[in-house]
């Protein structure tokens, strides 16, 4: 294995890639959720185990089935997990054939002078010297929600970080960047492996500028709150005043002006989900 800590023990940036779609859309959510415990769900822990298995397969050059019955991060490697992870491993190896593969590529965005430390780890990064193309691949183990690849803030964040790391550490300067999502447990009409390609300038300048502007907005004392589909994974959803206002407005529209709204803290996760769904915030 690598000298990286286990996936479950890795540090996470307050303005990280996995939550980028939330804090870009709702800058105030960062300050509102400060100090709140990030309690991992069983689904998230299982996804972490799948990522650990994928890394083991790539580093040891083994099939996922070679680890059947082993326990990783508290989860047994089952045939279903091995089958799903193998889809990702095969996709990475296909893309890496004849090229240079970097597994679990760590990066930071300090070269961009962000307002707070911004860093992360890309699952797999592949350099194609002939085409001057950098490919960043991301395993998504979730089965319930389709993950988009086109203009994804999370994947673009990973790609930007990987590109900066390649420039600084290996003197690699791509002209094109390909971003690939591998989601083997979701039956997407476009398949388990989906990709999106852009020119390096768009990522290095245009996306980077937008990302930094959003990062600076999160540090403002009056950073705005903006409810949306990103609320579903926000730690502060139960105490968010804007989400509460949304609940009150919807309830009064359904009932009458004498409706007594609940306190934000009393809203269950199911109630919050229902509020967002009724507001037509969960599209696609």
Residue map of PLM features:
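Glycine- and charge-rich intrinsically disordered segments
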Residues: 1-10, 241, 246-247, 254, ...
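Short amphipathic alpha-helical segments and their helix-coil junctions
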Residues: 5-10, 25-38, 136, 144, ...
